């Protein structure tokens, strides 16, 4: 399906012909808030935008056609989609304000992953969606709560979407201690306090194919990421890949692009993070593949890598 009705989506009723999906979702949420304004409510609003297919309303795309972007962001259709998203988020916030619900409503804006390199370059972050590098896992995050969170305040704490549930649980006064929580309560951050000393873990023991073997800037030409794990502790980030045991260490405070691997020159920090990662995997029974794939074809991989290298070489001569 696409962003214009009829949507060809079995989970979505069609609207009037030509209806724009982002507007449709905005309307649904505004109507929901109107209906439940005198009750406690929770609205999870996963806008399809911005996601492929990249389809903007014609008038919004035309608005950006003659505007100059930069080296990494220069697509009128993408910009038009973002404006529609921004407009509908504004409608939701305005409705909350109009109904005098702002002081009793926590608003969270975020994303599930980094952008796709082929559509929107994440520079200076490395790689993009599907990668362990910052371009794949670092996303925007905004909390808004009138009277509870200082306007335009900023925090540089590293947090995760798994923290939302414990945070909301605390706010609504749920005292159920039997729940096993992976995240932490972020309410102290709302008051300007710190939750430092907490590490973040990412574990993905499978393969994820590359979008573009030349430009994805992942661990290798064939995959955006290979089976592995990552730990972020303070300003340090360690990657561990299962196939060959490869380890990469970065200081992401000084090197957000993850361009300088410090694992060899800083063995003490490498061991510290690797030990922490192993302890976390053992505690959580994180699966690690140990059996080799009997259908693995090394000759095919070598031939693909050979073609890739030769195409890169040909382009460098042309340029």
Sequence positions of predicted segments:
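Formylglycine-dependent
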Residues: 1-41, 47-49, 53-56, 211-221
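Active-site rim elements
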Residues: 12-19, 74-79, 148-158, 171-178, ...
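A long, amphipathic alpha-helix that forms part
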Residues: 20, 24-34, 62-104
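Active-site His/acidic residue clusters
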Residues: 29-77, 116, 122-123
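Loop/turn elements at helix/coil->beta-strand transitions in domains of secreted/extracellular proteins
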Residues: 37-43, 101-107, 195-198, 234-236
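Histidine-centered active-site microenvironments of extracellular/periplasmic hydrolases
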Residues: 53-59, 94-148, 160, 309, ...
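C-terminal cap/loop subdomain of S1 sulfatases and analogous C-terminal strand-loop tails that border
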Residues: 115-120, 124-132, 149-150, 157, ...
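Long, internal low-complexity/basic segments
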Residues: 164, 201, 207, 243-246, ...
